[in-house]
Regions:
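A cross-family glycoside hydrolase active-site/sugar-binding cleft signature
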Residues: 56-58, 79-81, 100-102, 123-125, ...
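Active-site-proximal loop/turn and secondary-structure-junction residues that shape catalytic pockets
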Residues: 61-63, 84-85, 105-106, 126-128, ...
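Active-site loop/helix belt of alpha/beta enzymes
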Residues: 152-289, 347, 378-380
């Protein structure tokens, strides 16, 4: 399924011309496809069949309330890493009882609030965190549901910034250390052991590292069972990649089946983020100037690295497409560069496009880690976000104004009265 397609030489989002959206909502603009989000989530959900499972969408990938609401209506669970994300889920109609709380630095306030709201489970990432969760639960005269995030020490072929399953990474605890933590939790009056969690990284396009991690986790679960500690679920994390540049991606159905073949009766929790929203969003920007220096040709656009950080942060590739065919434009190999005062401010390099001033260019598969990583660098207002459903569309985030940039700031007055 691909809900962004060309009709009569113009790019459409579902049944709406992207140019029409740009004229109504302005540039730059994030555009999301409701049906693509739903279809991606259903692909994971249906792959499990009748096996007990919970698809917990990773909120960090795209936390817009409009996106979360689409998933909440489908019955999705959510993987959250802050109390702000949990409150967003609830505001969007999601259920806290279907949320797992991940992250390495949960504060006492966050733990208390999560217990008050009744989350499904804490994914505990260290011995110190286990002590803190137990302490807060004791003060509240309750039991905290926990799993322990185990670091399986599995290497993956992805950017080092988003590899999370090696011993040198900050996430989780070693298999050896986890045994003593599980024993402590099992005998605590204020902790309730629910399961085991791991997450090995993001944008992974092969099944083998997932299965290697799963086998290590299941071996640990067997050891724990021999000690009288039983698990009700295994949380296999997220990390399934998408095709940014025609990469071969994982077959979801085959991946899930390979998991089900090994887990027995254990409930499976899965935390996809990018795979749910990545190809369900595009970032559209307008050409302000064309500049051909003889060495390089630059299409200077109104979108920038503060709007879509992935290219400058990770060296990531997004397909760049002219929104409408323009035979009057200049055909060249362009770098798409923005107005930020940094040489690293680019969204694409060496792309063969036919462009003229005023044209719109779409950066494809920008639905994940797009707006959520944006900033106000160079005092630039953050852009608007729009959701499309068939022929309908609506603003799901207003564009910031220049005035909103400093409405929470004040001038320090050091005059002596």
């Amino acid at each position: 399924m691909n809900t962004f397609s060309f009709k009569n030489k113009a790019l459409y989002a579902e049944s709406v011309a992207v140019t029409d959206l740009m004229e109504q909502y302005g540039s730059p603009l994030y555009i999301y496809s409701r049906s693509q989000i739903a279809s991606n989530w259903q692909q994971f959900n249906q792959a499990f069949g009748d096996h007990p499972h919970l698809i917990c969408y990773a909120v960090k990938a795209n936390s817009n309330l409009g996106v979360l609401n689409v998933l909440a209506k489908l019955g999705s669970g959510f993987d959250i890493v802050s109390i702000g994300e949990l409150e967003r889920v609830i505001a969007a109609g999601g259920k806290p009882g279907r949320c797992v709380f991940s992250g390495v630095s949960k504060t006492e306030t966050e733990i208390q609030r999560a217990l008050e709201l009744g989350i499904y489970c804490f994914n505990v990432e260290s011995a110190a965190e286990l002590d803190r969760v137990e302490s807060v639960a004791k003060l509240m005269s309750t039991k905290a549901p926990i799993s322990i995030r185990v670091n399986p020490d599995v290497d993956v072929n992805t950017h080092p910034y988003i590899a999370t399953g090696l011993k040198e990474n900050k996430f989780g605890v070693s298999v050896d250390r986890s045994l003593s933590l599980y024993k402590k939790a099992e005998f605590s009056k204020h902790l309730d052991v629910f399961g085991l969690d791991y997450h090995i990284g993001s944008q992974i396009n092969e099944v083998s590292p997932f299965i290697e991690a799963l086998e290590k986790a299941l071996e640990l679960i067997s050891q724990l069972k021999a000690e009288g500690i039983k698990m009700s679920h295994i949380d296999i994390g997220g990390g399934v990649g998408i095709a940014y540049n025609e990469e071969k991606t994982i077959n979801i159905e085959k991946y899930v089946q390979s998991v089900l073949d090994k887990v027995g009766d254990l409930e499976v929790i899965l935390e996809p983020g990018r795979a749910i929203v990545g190809n369900a969003g595009i970032f559209v920007t307008q050409v302000e100037y064309l500049k051909q220096s003889g060495v390089k040709s630059f299409a200077i656009i109104d979108g920038a690295m503060n709007d879509l950080q992935r290219p400058s942060l990770y060296g990531s590739y997004h397909q760049a497409i002219a929104v409408e065919d323009n035979s009057k434009g200049i055909k060249d190999t362009w770098d798409l560069v923005g107005p930020i005062c940094e040489t690293g401010d680019f969204l694409a390099k060496d792309r063969e496009l036919t462009l003229e001033q005023g044209d719109y260019v779409a950066l494809m598969s920008a639905g994940a880690y797009g707006f959520v990583l944006s900033s106000n660098y160079n005092s630039r207002p953050r852009v608007a976000e729009v959701m499309v459903s068939g022929s309908s569309h609506a603003l799901v985030r207003k564009r910031e104004t220049v005035g909103s940039l400093f409405e929470n700031e004040c001038i320090f007055n050091d005059e002596i009265n």
